[in-house]
Design a protein with these regions (language model features):
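N-terminal beta1-alpha1 cap of cysteine-dependent amidohydrolase-like domains
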Residues: 1-109, 120-121, 127, 131-134
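Active-site loop->helix "elbow" adjoining a glycine-rich segment at hydrolase catalytic centers
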Residues: 113-115, 122
């Protein structure tokens, strides 16, 4: 029996009060898992953790998007705009998981902020505030 591909998906993370919960929470937009199911994959939600022990079982990695910015320190810049909103724990986790997963030579997809993270991970930079740039 063939096993369906197992795809790990990173989650969004919020600590703010007066949102969904007064406690920190993870979120994943449903369309990520719906699309993977549609194409015969088994999605696995990857909550943000301090350590990353076992990701060898993943056949692919999807770095999801979110409503935040990559901390400019990751691409060698200081914060130049008060519009920058980072989620330090999430970005740190996603960099750690990429460091462990990339050497496995398996598929990685970044969507929206995930694509930006991949760009920075591989040495690229970002425009911090497009409105002031143009």
């Amino acid at each position: 029996m063939n096993r369906s591909p197992v795809i790990g998906i990173t989650t969004d993370y919020k600590e703010k009060e007066n949102t969904y919960s007064k406690y920190p929470w993870f979120a994943l937009r449903r369309h990520y898992s719906d699309c993977l199911y549609k194409f015969g994959c088994t999605p696995i939600v990857l909550p943000i953790t301090e350590t990353i022990e076992n990701i060898d079982f993943l056949d692919g990695l999807l770095i999801s998007g979110g409503d935040f910015d990559i901390d400019p320190k990751y691409y060698g810049e200081n914060t130049q705009s008060d519009k920058i909103q980072t989620i330090k724990d999430r970005t740190k986790f996603e960099f750690k998981i990429l460091e462990k997963y990339f050497p496995l030579n398996r598929p990685i997809l970044g969507i929206c902020g995930g694509c930006q993270l991949l760009n920075v991970f591989f040495g690229g930079s970002l425009i911090q505030d497009i409105e002031s740039f143009i």
